[in-house]
């Protein structure tokens, strides 16, 4: 997790961060923690290595989707409900998946405006401009689709396991990571 934090710090305020950079950051943070927890459960249950690895990959993908959902919530959740200020990541210079997608989809003039907002630091007017562009380019939906795809892949990792209450519980946890509002 420390590696992920350091990588994120090195990319703070960098509008040229790629989707691969972002995925590497979230893989080394929340996803690493959830993956380790799932792997430990398999080890303690004396499961074969194939199932241990499947559970670890399930945890990694759920952790990545959870972080994506958290990053998306930063731009859409009610501040009172979420418990943190709208646009907090932007204010801290964190370039997350929605901004990466916006920088891919926006026209050249809009890209320049977004880069300026990122480089100049947080201003409420900048956040409002970004939120308008998110709406114009359907960025929240596109970002949620990426997270949803990860959840589907995470569930597929558990195909080695027979249907059971435990497997269903893991599926519910995976689904919750996207449906939460806090």
Predicted features by range, described:
Residues 1-182:
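All-alpha prenyltransferase/terpene-synthase fold signal
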């Amino acid at each position: 997790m420390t590696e992920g934090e350091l990588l994120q710090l090195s990319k703070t305020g960098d509008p040229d961060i790629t989707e691969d950079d972002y995925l590497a950051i979230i893989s080394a943070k929340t996803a690493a923690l959830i993956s380790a927890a799932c792997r430990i459960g398999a080890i303690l249950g004396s499961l074969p290595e194939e199932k241990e690895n499947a559970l670890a990959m399930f945890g990694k993908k759920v952790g990545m989707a959870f972080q994506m959902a958290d990053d998306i919530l930063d731009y859409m959740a009610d501040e009172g409900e979420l418990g943190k200020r709208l646009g907090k990541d932007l204010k801290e210079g964190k370039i997350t998946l929605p901004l990466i997608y916006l920088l891919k989809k926006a026209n050249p003039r809009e890209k320049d405006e977004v880069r300026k907002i990122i480089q100049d630091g947080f201003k409420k007017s900048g956040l409002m401009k970004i939120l308008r562009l998110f709406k114009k380019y359907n960025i929240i939906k596109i970002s949620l689709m990426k997270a949803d795809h990860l959840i589907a892949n995470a569930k597929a990792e558990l195909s080695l396991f027979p249907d059971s209450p435990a497997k269903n519980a893991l599926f519910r946890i995976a689904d919750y990571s996207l449906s939460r509002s806090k």
